[in-house]
């Protein structure tokens, strides 16, 4: 028997999700168009947004669709950093792990190189786990300056 354990980058869709996706892919019409096919597609898109918002306990305006995880990580990391830094320019500290996925590490590095972010990496224990004492130290040391912890 084979067991697949790399669900970080891909996983099988549930049958109901696959059916819904296939049905949506058959629809014609750009959701930004004013013709009837576009309006029908827009209705499905907005109904999906409402369902996700309700399932997550979020506002519908907080549900943002993108093309995948890397794009989502970029939007989230940069958006949170910029928002925190805009509210308080001293909030430039990002705390992260050296074992984060590159979809996280790359925008963090970009913020350091281009936006003045100060990045601190949590130390790892010999077994590869995060050193939570070091994380606590970093939070205590930079508490008023933290923009983001990933």
Q: Can you annotate each of these PLM segments?
A:
Residues 1-150:
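Pyridoxal 5′-phosphate
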């Amino acid at each position: 028997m084979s067991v697949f354990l790399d669900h970080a980058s891909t996983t099988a869709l549930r049958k109901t999700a696959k059916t819904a996706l296939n049905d949506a892919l058959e629809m014609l019409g750009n959701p930004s168009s004013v013709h009837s096919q576009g309006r029908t597609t827009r209705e499905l898109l907005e109904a999906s947004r409402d369902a996700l918002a309700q399932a997550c306990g979020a506002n519908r305006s907080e549900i943002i669709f993108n093309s995948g995880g890397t794009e989502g990580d970029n939007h989230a990391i940069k958006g949170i950093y910029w928002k925190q830094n805009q509210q308080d320019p001293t909030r430039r500290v990002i705390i992260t792990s050296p074992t984060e996925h590159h979809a996280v590490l790359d925008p963090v590095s970009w913020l350091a190189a281009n936006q003045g972010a100060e990045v601190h990496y949590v130390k790892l224990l010999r077994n590869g786990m995060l050193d939570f004492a070091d994380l606590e130290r970093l939070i205590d040391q930079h508490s008023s300056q933290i923009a983001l912890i990933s």
